[in-house]
Amino acid sequence: MGKVLEYFNCGIIGYGKIGYSIGNHLLQRGIKPTVYDINPIKQISALNRECNIDNKNNIVSNSEVLFLATGNHSLNIHDFRKIKNGSYIFSVTSSDDELDDSYLETEYTIEEIKPNIYKYYNSNNWFYLVKKGNAVNFLHNAVMDDFIYLVMSEMIVAAQLLIKSQDLHKKNNILETNESVKKKISKIWLDVFKNGKY
C-alpha cells in the first residue's frame, strides 16, 4: 500500500516458531513488536528477545499491523469489532484455522481494493484483511520456492511413521520426526535443489 512499516505499531498474536520469526524480522528492521501468547513461557521468551508484551485486547485495539500466528482461532467477531481503523491484518495459516470469521460477512462490507488486499468496513470500524485471512507466506512462490518441499516431505514421513506406529491408538500421544529423519530429508533436498544431482 506504499506505506513504511517502521512507522506502524506492530502486534503479534502467537509466539511459536513462526511468531518468533516474525518478531525477529521486525526487530532486525528496528521495529519493536508487541506480543501476546496464551503461554506465559512464550511471553517471557518474547520479552527476553526485547519485544513488548501485552494482553490480547490491547494488541488487537492498538496495533496498526497485526500478525496472527496461532493456528487456533486467534480472532473472533468481538475482536474484529475492536480493531483500530485502517489496520492491516496478516495471517500465516488458513483463515479456517486462524479466524472465527462466521459473522464477518454479515457485519462487514468487503471490498477488494488491490489484489489480495480486502477492506472490511461498517459504521463501527474498518480494516484490511490481507488474502481474506489466508496464509500470506504462500502468497508468492518466490517466498517459499523449493523450500516447501522440505515441509511437505517431513509431513509425508510423519504420516508414514504415524501409520506404522504401535502407539497409533493411544490417546494424548504426539509423534515427531527425529533429527536423523530431518537430516536425511535435508540432504536429499540439497542434492536435488542445490547440487542438481537428480
Regions found by a protein language model. Give the residues of each.
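Rossmann-like adenosine-cofactor binding region
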Residues: 47-125
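Hydrophobic alpha-helical scaffolding
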Residues: 12, 32-36, 53, 65, ...
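Generic hydrophobic/aromatic pocket-lining and core-packing "Φ" positions
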Residues: 22-23, 43, 80
